[in-house]
From Swiss-Prot:
The keyword Endoplasmic reticulum does not apply. The gene is prl1. Its main location: secreted. This is Prolactin-1. Pfam families: Hormone_1. The lineage of its organism: Eukaryota, Metazoa, Chordata, Craniata, Vertebrata.
Amino acid sequence: MAQRRTSGTNLFMTVLCVVAMCRAVPINELFERASQHSDKLHSLSTTLTQELDSHFPPIGRVIMPRPAMCHTSSLQTPIDKDQALQVSESDLMSLARSLLQAWSDPLVVLSSSASTLPHPAQSTIFNKIQEMQQYSKSLKDGLDVLSSKMGSPAQAITSLPYRGGTNLGHDKITKLINFNFLLSCLRRDSHKIDSFLKVLRCRAAKMQPEMC
């Protein structure tokens, strides 16, 4: 399984490198590959959230911060597909790249915290966080190439700094709550990234909006 994931990532980056040098691959195929990566990223975050929920203390659901506290909440984004379909290609790419960039540091925090997470599935969670980091890096590199083909508006990135610190808590419950909260923010943002890239994929393939 790990070998297949690595092979898929290598193939994706190989294709993008070819495009960067000779622009031989149609952009709709590149968006298809990017969409596959974003779909996997969102799938992993969803699976991890479900994994954590299976052993999440009841008090955690009461005191966990609300979604409005996520470090990316200040970014104005479409709230559904219909709104996303009204946004330009360049702006959608800029939004996707801004969100992806905003998770570079928090993913490191999640990875570091997962290594000592007080959870029965700690090893599985840690491995999936590592996998998410790989997909995130590969997708970021791919979107950098795609945005360069779309012009300067698509290359604009809104800074969304993470100020939550590297220590998610000293006691078991606090650490689980903060870890779950950060992961829930990632799940929400990975869904946005995936949705935006699927709209871009549809447009690149010249599909009808209702097919997106």
